[in-house]
């Protein structure tokens, strides 16, 4: 998934699952499974339920995404 292909949307983390996977509710009401990006893992950025995040979705599978940024 290259940067040009990814669809970026905003959402809110609803639930933390094992292996740095999260259930995220998007602004349009859909719920997806999202995993933490490698750069966020490397810098030990913590995500807790209730955080606002930016998610990159693949155009091929809109039910899974990658958390790219945590809003402050």
From Swiss-Prot:
It holds the Pfam family eIF-1a. It is found in: Cytoplasm. Keywords: Cytoplasm, Initiation factor, Protein biosynthesis, RNA-binding, rRNA-binding. GO terms for molecular function: ribosome binding; rRNA binding; translation initiation factor activity. GO terms for cellular component: cytosol. The keyword rRNA-binding applies. Coiled coil: none annotated. InterPro entries: NA-bd_OB-fold, RNA-binding_domain_S1_IF1, S1_domain, TIF_IF1. Belongs to the IF-1 family. This is Translation initiation factor IF-1. It comes from Treponema pallidum (strain Nichols).
């Amino acid at each position: 998934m290259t940067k040009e292909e990814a669809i970026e949307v905003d959402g809110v983390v609803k639930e933390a699952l094992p292996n740095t996977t999260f259930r995220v509710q998007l602004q349009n009401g859909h719920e997806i499974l999202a995993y933490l990006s490698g750069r966020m893992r490397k810098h030990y950025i913590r995500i807790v339920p209730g955080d606002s995040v930016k998610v990159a979705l693949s155009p091929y599978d809109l039910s899974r995404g990658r958390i790219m940024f945590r809003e402050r």
